[in-house]
């Protein structure tokens, strides 16, 4: 549960930052794009709780792992420049099924079989390790995102040189739109940064899957 929470919380932190830095979302719109993940758990959690004694928790957790992998792969191969709001919101909505079928069933499995006098201590330890894993996941995700962006930025920048006809053609097009050479260089640098952020985020999503 701690490892899964590490991946889940890292993605929660990464997605709004990506939407704001690359796609120009405000904090409100980034929150709205992330919010659909909470819709399904609101509906399913009471149902799962009511029929928990009739359900095999292991199957629910396995289903949630599969859904997590599907959503992370979905993001890894669909996040690209110019994507619309739905491209970020739909994976969040589907991930709600994974959230609903993960936390409560896995907590039930973790605490099942313990004597009543040890239940409080086990629950506290489980909550502590889950919170700690979330903090570690956030640190790892943000650090990896920054470092990978720097690497991809350097690799992409190498292609922008006087010997690359595509780069020279782009400069000519930008200057034809009224930009000076300095403005064109600044615009290209921003596009390279955005590409680096998207590629590094997609790599993190792929690893998480």
What are these regions (language model features)?
Residues 126-208:
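Hydrophobic transmembrane architecture of multi-pass small-molecule transporters
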Residues 1-121:
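Transmembrane core module of solute transporters
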Residues 35, 115, 127-128, 209:
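Charged, amphipathic alpha-helical interaction segments
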């Amino acid at each position: 549960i701690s490892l899964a929470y590490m991946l889940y919380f890292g993605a929660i932190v990464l997605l709004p930052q990506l939407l704001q830095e690359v796609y120009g979302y405000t904090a409100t719109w980034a929150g709205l794009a992330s919010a659909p993940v909470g819709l399904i758990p609101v509906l399913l959690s009471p149902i799962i709780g009511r029929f928990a004694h009739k359900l095999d928790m292991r199957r629910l957790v396995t289903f949630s792992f599969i859904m997590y992998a599907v959503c992370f792969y979905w993001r890894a191969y669909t996040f690209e420049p110019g994507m619309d709001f739905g491209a970020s919101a739909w994976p969040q909505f589907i991930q709600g099924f994974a959230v609903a079928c993960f936390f409560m069933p896995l907590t039930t499995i973790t605490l099942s079989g313990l004597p009543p006098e040890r239940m409080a201590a086990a629950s506290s330890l489980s909550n502590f390790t889950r919170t700690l894993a979330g903090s570690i996941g956030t640190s790892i995700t943000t650090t990896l995102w920054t470092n990978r962006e720097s690497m991809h930025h350097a690799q992409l920048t190498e292609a922008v040189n006087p010997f690359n006809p595509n780069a020279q053609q782009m400069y000519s097009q930008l200057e034809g739109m009224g930009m000076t050479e300095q403005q064109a260089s600044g615009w290209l640098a921003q596009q390279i940064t955005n590409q680096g952020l998207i590629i590094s985020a997609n790599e993190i999503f792929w690893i998480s899957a």
